[in-house]
């Protein structure tokens, strides 16, 4: 697994904010550090698309630089971020929860540089540095809709979930999905497992085939690149075996087997926050965690218009009439208090 770094130098005509870009400077370099492979057909691909949009909308003096390191190794993250600092980056995006710890340390050590991080996981007592913005997604809201659809569509009344590495983010997919399914059909049977990898396609394929062989006819996965294995399993089996994807619309990989994808539009969030900063004299409103969900249009289903019957559910979630669980504790409360199971 590798880390790709993109550097974009963007020519601006105004002076820059207090966070380290010298007044009178004419351009800023925007960098992105991605945990994992860039073209994962999912989470990281969405972030990369945002950079391509920035490149298109701010085309002057753009340069692209690649680097790589071993995923999950803290010292490698630090080394790559030091290189970005030496290259003159004024804004650095970190994509992936594995980069949460290093995001805090580098932002504290380099107050002159602005940072953003996608999907950070911090303790409740952590104070976010003023030059750091964290973006988290209420992905459980989209997964709830997917689970509801899966339960309605399943012929066998057996559905599955395959996650990558167990953690807060993957669990949000899982428990949102399970809650939505139970909301649609209290008697639905749900099997949830983890591949313990975001990149091992073969393991995910084996797990999917095992589930399908036991009568499960729909599998939702949230496993990064490994999810391709689930898609391949359904495609090879043919009619009657379905998948629900994650992060991006992946239906082109198996059009006849896809029901929908739970969209976490990392790209839209990254683009929105960055472009607003660029348009506002490079002011970076850090020191906070920004939550985005159905209400913001960055979480949902890839083909929501095909499922008119979920519109009322969307409204109830947005209006907080339905509080979707994102973890096991919340799910158990949901089952007992809402569904009376």
UniProtKB/Swiss-Prot annotation:
UniProt cross-references to SUPFAM superfamilies, sorted A to Z: Periplasmic binding protein-like I (SSF53822)
Bridged cysteine pairs (disulfide): none
InterPro entries, A to Z: BMP_lipoprotein, Peripla_BP_I, PnrA-like
Membrane-crossing segments per the record: none
Signal peptide: 1-14
Protein location: Cell inner membrane
Covalently lipidated residues, kind S-diacylglycerol cysteine: 15
Keyword annotations: Cell inner membrane, Cell membrane, Lipoprotein, Membrane, Palmitate, Signal, Transport
PROSITE patterns, alphabetized: PROKAR_LIPOPROTEIN
Membrane topology: Lipid-anchor
Lipid positions (N-palmitoyl cysteine): 15
Principal place of residence: membrane
Pfam families: Bmp (PF02608)
Family in the record: Belongs to the BMP lipoprotein family.
Summary of subunit composition and partner proteins: Monomer.
Function: May be part of an ABC-type nucleoside uptake system involved in the purine salvage pathway.
The protein's name in its UniProt record: Basic membrane protein B
Species, as recorded: Borreliella afzelii (strain PKo)
Gene name linked to the record: bmpB
